[in-house]
């Protein structure tokens, strides 16, 4: 507020009216006005106001406000806080739209929006304000229009919030899918790593087994070679040992047979040629000897031998 032009607000009060019109104001002295709550009619017409601050809406004691012939291009969203406002003159400003909060002015009974570049739907709802009746109708229609806009805004806000929630859900779902894919990839990687280690372990075990098998084969070859060498040496010694044993056995046997033959021949000779042939022990022997001789003479082979011997003598 230009304090040089308005020295004392109190001097501008007449009853319940505070007249600050034609004061060349570019902003409203909200703090000073709040000190006079009994001044329920505020005249700010014919000034250079472009906007109203949100703090202006704290002057809830105001019932009537005249803002005609200013340069207002917008009203604060908080204007709905002026719950006691019944009369609002906005004639000849530069307003195109009204804030959604305007629908909260439930006490508003009179409104003038003439000579403002209003957007078509708002201008149609406002209509003319050439007399008291039309201005009252303007207030009613504009409030109704703003309530519809508020409902649409709330629905749009709800749709936007719903869309944002859906987008957030999709984002969360994508994040979960991404995490699941990463988890699955990590799990697969671990499984592949485990399989690789298992194959390496099996390869190591197989290599060790192959080495053991080769070592075993080499040992078996060495053992077989040693056995073959032993077998080659053994046949040479074993037959010699066998031959020596057999020779010794046959030699002893032959000697025994010769001794037996000599013994038997001696006994037979004694019993046949000496006077002992009449002895008791020689009689059976002589009988057996004679039987043996007769049996031998009966053999063809013996006869052939005797014949050959006779032929040789002649």
Curated annotation (Swiss-Prot):
Residues 1-247 are cytoplasmic. It is found in: Microsome membrane; Endoplasmic reticulum membrane; Nucleus envelope. It is a single-pass type II membrane protein. Keywords: Coiled coil, Endoplasmic reticulum, Leucine-rich repeat, Membrane, Microsome, Nucleus, Repeat, Signal-anchor, Transmembrane, Transmembrane helix. The chain crosses the membrane at residues 248-268. It comes from the Eukaryota. One of its GO terms (cellular component) is cytoplasm. Residues 269-314 are lumenal. Residues 165-197, 212-237 are annotated as: Disordered. Gene3D superfamilies: Ribonuclease Inhibitor (3.80.10.10). GO terms for biological process: intracellular signal transduction. LRR repeats lie at residues 14-35, 38-60, 61-82, 84-106, 107-126. Residues 146-216 form a coiled coil. InterPro entries: Leu-rich_rpt, Leu-rich_rpt_typical-subtyp, LRR_dom_sf, LRR_domain-containing. Signal peptide: none annotated. Residues 215-225 have a biased composition (Basic residues). It holds the Pfam family LRR_8. Interacts with SGO1. Required for nuclear import of FGF1. This is Leucine-rich repeat-containing protein 59. The lineage of its organism: Eukaryota, Metazoa, Chordata, Craniata, Vertebrata.
């Amino acid at each position: 507020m230009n304090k040089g032009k308005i020295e004392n607000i109190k001097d501008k009060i007449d009853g319940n009216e505070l007249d600050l019109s034609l004061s060349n104001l570019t902003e409203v002295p909200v703090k000073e006005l709040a000190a006079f709550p009994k001044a329920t009619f505020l005249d700010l017409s014919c000034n250079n106001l472009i906007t109203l601050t949100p703090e202006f809406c704290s002057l809830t004691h105001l019932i009537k406000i005249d803002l005609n012939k200013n340069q207002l291009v917008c009203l604060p969203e908080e204007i709905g806080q002026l719950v006691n406002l019944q009369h609002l003159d906005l004639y000849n400003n530069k307003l195109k739209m009204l804030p959604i909060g305007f629908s909260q002015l439930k006490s508003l009974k009179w409104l003038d929006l003439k000579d403002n570049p209003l957007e078509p739907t708002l201008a149609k709802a406002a209509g003319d304000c050439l007399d008291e009746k039309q201005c009252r109708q303007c207030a009613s229609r504009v409030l109704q229009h703003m309530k519809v806009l508020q409902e649409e805004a709330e629905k749009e806000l709800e749709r936007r919030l719903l869309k944002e929630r859906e987008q957030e859900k999709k984002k969360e779902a994508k994040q979960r899918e991404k995490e699941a894919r990463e988890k699955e990839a990590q799990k697969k990687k671990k499984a592949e790593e485990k399989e690789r280690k298992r194959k390496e372990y099996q390869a190591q075990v197989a290599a060790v087994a192959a080495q053991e098998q080769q070592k075993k084969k080499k040992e078996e070859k060495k053992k077989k070679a040693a056995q073959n060498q032993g077998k080659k040496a053994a046949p040479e010694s074993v037959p010699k040992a066998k031959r020596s044993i057999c020779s010794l056995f046959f030699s002893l046997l032959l000697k025994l047979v010769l001794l037996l033959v000599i013994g038997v021949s001696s006994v037979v000779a004694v019993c046949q040629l000496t006077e002992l042939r009449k002895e008791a022990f020689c009689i059976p022997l002589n009988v057996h000897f004679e039987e043996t001789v007769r049996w031998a003479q009966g053999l063809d082979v013996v006869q052939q031998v005797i014949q050959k011997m006779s032929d040789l003598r002649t």
